[in-house]
Amino acid sequence: MTEKLYLTSPMPPSVNHYTSVRTIIKNGKPLSMVYETKEAKDYKKAFKKIIEDEVKKQNWTREVNDTQHFYIDAVFYFDRIDKDCANYEKCLDDTITETQLIWIDDNVALFRPQRIYYDKYNPRIELTIYPVEYVGIFDSDVQKRMFETNCKTCKRYARNCSILKKAIEGRIQPEIHGCVCEKYSEIKN
């Protein structure tokens, strides 16, 4: 069974209200600086608390690493019908990332809006976060382990094979076709 984390986020600021720009004069020249809005800071503070509480309450014990990807299935409850769900992911993902409780960097987050409802009394986003089945270029952990088992009998493995490392990171390489490595060279006894 796949471990899942359920979160309910207040409505984050849209990308239009997440950051703003201020211009200052430095050494007689204008310099534009991007800063996080008060709305974004307030949202992040509130949502981080929710994440921390729910991780403990739901006993989310997954080890955080930089290669595990996660689905984030999102159900939106907007207060108005003129809103676009594509504008609300960034601040939400960044907030989850800042906790460092689920992932290290949101480059592993696969945000998937599932449905949109309208609730003017309680706007929110309900999230279901769970690890994907694939590992790098492999369709499953079983497929990765089979490939890795074969790698252990190759000369390159003892020298920290970069092909295996890149495959686990999800990098497409010309040396691998159909889960077979063209650079495989069996260790001679």
Regions found by a protein language model. Name each.
Residues 1-189:
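Acidic, proline/glycine-enriched N-terminal capping motif
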